[in-house]
Amino acid sequence: PGYDAMFSAAAETNQAISCLVNADGLPEIDRMCSVHPNVTVVIDHLGRIGIDGVIRDSDVDMLCSLAKHEKVHVKGSAFYALGKDKPGHSDLVPLIRRVYDAYGPDRLMWASDAPPSLAVETYEDQISLIRDRISFLSEMDRDKIMRDTAARVVFFQ
């Protein structure tokens, strides 16, 4: 009942819902997006896929399947907490690629997850994965992911 009330209120007030859920919560988000197709939804932290150190294809499949809902967006953030948690986060690149292929840069956004993230890595560490180390992103893609998508979705710009 809580999700129903939240999605109904978001629909009435034209607000985006930011969902901090693990991968096992994505099916319920899918159901709610089917019931409320006009609600803008942002999945935080790549659906927390890999929070236990393992990136499961089934979890990535579920996250990518939500792209069928045109108002669903994904936030790439908390890289320090996902996957193998190694500097550079290169193990997350295949996950990011699949999500990029499903959603495109207009429905992806980056976030720092500060202040918690600053306890384990610098701000530079956080932005460098998207900004510098993912070769399949164009400069325009990076601008959208790092700035434009969030400006449009969160700040209605």
Protein language model features and the residues they cover:
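Catalytic pocket-lining loop regions of alpha/beta-barrel enzymes
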Residues: P1-M109
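Mid-to-C-terminal alpha-helical segments outside catalytic/metal-binding sites
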Residues: R98, A102-M109, L118-Q157
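Short, active-site-adjacent cap segments at secondary-structure transitions
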Residues: A81, P116-L118
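Active-site glycine-centered loops adjacent to acidic/histidine catalytic or metal-binding residues
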Residues: D113
